[in-house]
């Protein structure tokens, strides 16, 4: 991955790489024969200008980066970050990028299969120090779904393997209710949205039955698309993803 911002905004977001560094890296990637790679753009820095953000995106596009991930810095100015994200949606779409997730943009044929698997709530096995794993049995849902993380220290990790003892730092079992909430949080970030039938089948949560009034209000405000089987955020709703998700999860009660 290549990460960067406009030269004039590097200090504003704490980025140590220059545009020249990024260009050299991309040339090396091309010479090595890679056609699938991703670049990162950082936004939300306290001193980052709108012009700088535009230049940062334009630079990545001009270098031919096929997949972009936007990283948000929470500096307290939510309005500024929303404005930058709104600009990115418009700008990158016009350049042929599809916003398949809130902060992941790809040209046709260049979506990250790993990211799509994550946002589909698929099982993941993480290997190495500090790696995180999520493992859920096949349908129907089971309380045996687990999430765990390995110890971050390399020495402790190796010693655990040598002693035939799993070097796990944290391990938790997830209830069906907790899984339903996670699935909602993940899917509401995606362009495809939250499949209400899948939510009911996988996690026994019938959201439309429980939150019909809330969904109706969100639809009237232009924050979600009208679809009897799916909740997908509009571009306006995407700028309020966290607030909409918190509202729906809060109204569901504790996990």
Named regions from a protein language model:
Residues 230-235:
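Minor-groove-contacting beta-hairpin "wing" of winged helix-turn-helix DNA-binding domains
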Residues 219-229:
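A short, conserved structural fragment
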Residues 181-184, 214, 244:
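Structural preference for long, well-ordered alpha-helical segments in enzyme cores
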Residues 196-197, 209-210, 226:
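Extended hydrophobic-aromatic, low-complexity segments
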Residues 1-205, 253-254:
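C-terminal scaffold of the Radical SAM
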Residues 236-255:
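Short, amphipathic alpha-helical interaction segments positioned at domain boundaries
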């Amino acid at each position: 991955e290549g990460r960067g911002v406009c030269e004039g905004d590097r200090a504003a977001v704490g980025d140590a790489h220059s545009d020249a560094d990024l260009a050299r890296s991309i040339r090396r990637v091309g010479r090595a024969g890679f056609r699938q790679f991703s670049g990162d753009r950082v936004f939300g820095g306290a001193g980052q200008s709108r012009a700088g953000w535009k230049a940062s995106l334009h630079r990545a596009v001009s270098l031919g980066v096929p997949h972009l991930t936007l990283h948000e810095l929470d500096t307290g100015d939510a309005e500024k970050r929303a404005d930058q994200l709104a600009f990115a949606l418009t700008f990158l779409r016009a350049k042929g990028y599809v916003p398949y997730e809130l902060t992941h943009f790809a040209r046709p044929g260049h979506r990250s299969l790993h990211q799509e698997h994550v946002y589909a709530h698929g099982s993941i096995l993480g290997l190495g120090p500090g790696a995180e794993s999520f493992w859920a049995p096949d349908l129907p849902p089971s309380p045996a779904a687990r999430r765990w993380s390995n110890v971050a220290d390399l020495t402790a990790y190796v010693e655990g393997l040598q002693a035939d003892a799993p070097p796990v730092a944290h391990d938790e079992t997830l209830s069906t209710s907790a899984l339903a909430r996670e699935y909602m949080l993940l899917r509401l970030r995606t362009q495809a949205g939250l499949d209400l039938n899948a939510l009911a089948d996988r996690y026994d949560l019938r959201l439309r039955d429980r939150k019909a009034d809330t969904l109706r209000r969100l639809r009237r405000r232009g924050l979600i698309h009208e679809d009897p089987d799916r909740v997908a955020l509009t571009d306006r709703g995407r700028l309020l993803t966290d607030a909409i998700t918190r509202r729906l999860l809060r109204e569901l009660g504790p996990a």
